[in-house]
């Protein structure tokens, strides 16, 4: 597989272009669901901490800020669904901002709050951030490389006994995420292309039957005459 095939998920590029608005709309709908879930979860967690006496401002305040950001992104996504002219670029912007929000939470709670421990949470974030939405491989690769650059710079700046392990685990998580995200979106485009071809075949068959049904009465009348 060459680079062109990789970036187009193995399909001809011109066949994927009509599906960009469909992809953008699906991503915005997904973002509204994620935004609702995160807004609730990021508020419930600090409340539970307060109820059980584990309130710590450095742990709870970022979650409340993230809940507000998730709510804002959800409302913005809902408004964009009603604006088809700017659907594709705004969908890319909003999904990128949501992915950045999740990554920043992973960086804060793993690298900043626990700088000398193995980055389990951040590795999980590096994996799932590529699976949140359907995007082109080039976009996913940019997201992965940006995240890895942040991790490497941080590990080089802060003394950490698990430096090499953390970098290696984040790198492996990014590779797995890229692989899974590519096949996930590849299968999605495959289903869309299959549905389009089936619809075209049914329309062609319907038009053929209509033409035959119009031709048959004239043929019979000509034979009788």
Give residue ranges: language-model regions.
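Non-catalytic regulatory/interaction regions at protein termini and inter-domain linkers
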Residues: 1-25
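Alpha-helical transmembrane segments and their helix-entry boundary regions
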Residues: 132, 136-142
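Loop-to-transmembrane alpha-helix initiation sites
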Residues: 160-172
